[in-house]
Each structure stands twice: as C-alpha cells, then as structure tokens.
Amino acid sequence: VALKDPAIDMDLKLNTNDIGFKEILSLIPAIYATEFSSLKTDGTATLTATAKGILQGDTVPAFNIDMQVKNAMFRYPALLAGVDQINISANVQNPGGNIDLTTVNINPFSFRLAGNPFSLTATVKTPISDPDFKAEAKGVLNLGMIKQVYPLGDIELNGTIDADMQMSGRLSSIEKEEYERIQASGTIGLTG
C-alpha cells in the first residue's frame, strides 16, 4: 500500500486457510448477540481476496473476493432443530475504475432448514446505477420452523414459501412498473 495523496495505490492479497464456520457466523450481529457461546457448528469456510490499483474518490482498484462455505451446520442446543448442509460459493469482482462495474455471483447458497432443502443462485451486475439481476430459488421454507432453529423470543412466524422459480431483469423496470421487461418463470407458493 502506497499513499499518494490524495490516492492510495494498493496491491493486496488475502488467503485464509480453512476457518471454522462459527467464526463466519460471529460476523452476523443477530447470531453473535443470541446465545453465541452455546451455538454448535461444523463445516469450514475459506476466503481469498485481491485488490490492485488506485483508490481515489469514485475510482476503485481492481478487486476479486471469493468465499466458500462447505457442508456447514449450526444448532442451538436448547432448540429442537438446526440448519445443516449449508454450502455457499460467492464471488464479488471489479476490473477497476468504476464501482458500478462490480459483479456479484452467488452459486449456490443452499441449506436445509429443519429437514427442508432450499437453494438460491444469483448474479447482480451494475449494482449502483441500475442493478441487473438474475436469480433462481428452489425449495420449501416453513417459516414456523425458524423458531425451532433460532431463538426468536416472543416473535411468531407462520406460513410456508414453496419456490421453484427463475427471474431476471433490471431494478429500474420494477420501479417503473414495466413488468413485461422482467423475465420470470416457475412457481412460488405462499400459504399460511
């Protein structure tokens, strides 16, 4: 890292060895603040990141961030169930220059909540000016089961989301109610 007032010229690399999934969960305030010491976890995660170039004003260096979570799980011992088979492959990259050139890819983010599998894939481009997205979701989420895997206190959740859908388009099309410009297929069912 070189300070070239008013810019910063950087050439950074980060590569973690396998780290425990509990260390990743500790970064999520809602989980860390709720009986974190008793939380049982398994699975590993890796993180690699690079950044090379100039950071000045609206100009960003080229960067690439990869996160992998493999076969992870968490469970609060006082609760009936847990979340397992957690797998995440995520990448955020930018060729440098404009932050709006950033691309986010998540393929997959999958898990099993109290025995029900759910998976999501997503890609987002031009996240600042007009997010261009493509997403796919498949699985069943029984919202009432969340209380069995996470201590919600007095909060009650009910209902089921059953999804097998794909969607792509731009946020501006939704904001302008130009729904014909959004590509969508599949089904999503909401009950309860």
Language model feature labels by segment:
Residues V1-F109, N116-G192:
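Membrane-proximal interfacial segments on either side of biological membranes
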